[in-house]
Swiss-Prot record:
Molecular function per GO: serine-type endopeptidase inhibitor activity
SS bond list: C22-C76, C23-C38, C26-C72, C28-C36, C46-C53, C50-C65, C55-C63
Protein's name according to its UniProt entry: Bowman-Birk type proteinase inhibitor PVI-4
Compositionally biased region (Low complexity): 9-19
The organism's taxonomic lineage, starting at the top: Eukaryota, Viridiplantae, Streptophyta, Embryophyta, Tracheophyta
Organism name: Phaseolus vulgaris (Kidney bean)
Site (Reactive bond for trypsin): K30, S31
The UniProt record lists the keyword Transmembrane: no
Annotated region (Disordered), positions in chain: 1-21
Pfam families: Bowman-Birk_leg
Length: 85
């Protein structure tokens, strides 16, 4: 066990491009205001705006953001490539 922990504090600006808030799989309720939640899995950390990030203990860790917002972030797909469904 090494003390290797990923804190999603904004300590580095290097990862800002990859960790900018975006979401490919976002679902919203039909209520007003809507309650939207992103179900994207990210490796090792959640995006920079995420307050509730849960990660698995696998390597690499798979992380999901549990935040509920009244909007969806822009899709991330442009950074991943065309065939990502």
């Amino acid at each position: 066990k090494s003390g290797h922990r990923h804190e999603s504090x904004b300590s580095t600006b290097x990862a800002s491009x990859s960790s900018k808030p975006c979401c490919b799989h976002c679902a919203c309720t039909k209520s007003i205001p809507p309650q939207c939640r992103c179900s994207b899995l990210r490796l090792n950390s959640c995006h920079s705006e995420c307050k509730g990030c849960i990660c698995t203990f696998s390597i690499p860790a798979q992380c999901i953001c549990t935040d509920t917002n009244n909007f969806c972030y822009e899709p991330c797909k442009s950074s991943h490539g065309p065939b990502n469904n």
